[in-house]
Amino acid sequence: IPGGGGTKEFALRVSDELKDGQIDQNVLKDRFLTIAMAKVSTSGAEAADLGYLKAGKYSITMNRSRLIADAKTKALELADAGYTQPVRRTDIKVLGKSGLGIVYAGANSMFAGNYISEHDKKISEKLGYVMCGGDLSAPSIVSEQYLLDLEREAFLSLCGEKKTLERIQSIITKGKPLRN
């Protein structure tokens, strides 16, 4: 799972996308699958569609040779405008056990159908655990720090698994993911 705040960011975006009267689990499922299936964007527009870019907080450079220059210009504009890091949020809605049920049921059915390995199932469950805010009995409001702590715990526990280390080694040595 992403270990540098990426899972927290997707949980935050799920929270921002929830609307009254909407089925919360559908929003969670869409964002969960983006990470779980390791979807990669092939363009800036696709990255926005997948939720990797925050709405209204990005610009897309079409000419690859302009990437560095455009990034530098944007960074200087932000610095000149007095940009500071946003205050960490404490108003993130997570689904708790109701969301976890969806994640675990999906992981179990994918495993039973031989679409994913036992280790894939474990990773999916850890990812869902973080995105749902842990083992909370009901939908709750949590902070970014709470989600970051869950993410770090899940990431480090997976890093201690032999199968995870084998996957990392496969990526480094062969350039391909290992399905173990």
Describe each region flagged by the PLM:
Residues 1-17:
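Glycine-rich phosphate/ribose-binding loops and adjacent secondary-structure elements
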Residues 12-39, 43, 55-180:
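Intrinsically disordered, low-complexity segments enriched in small/flexible residues
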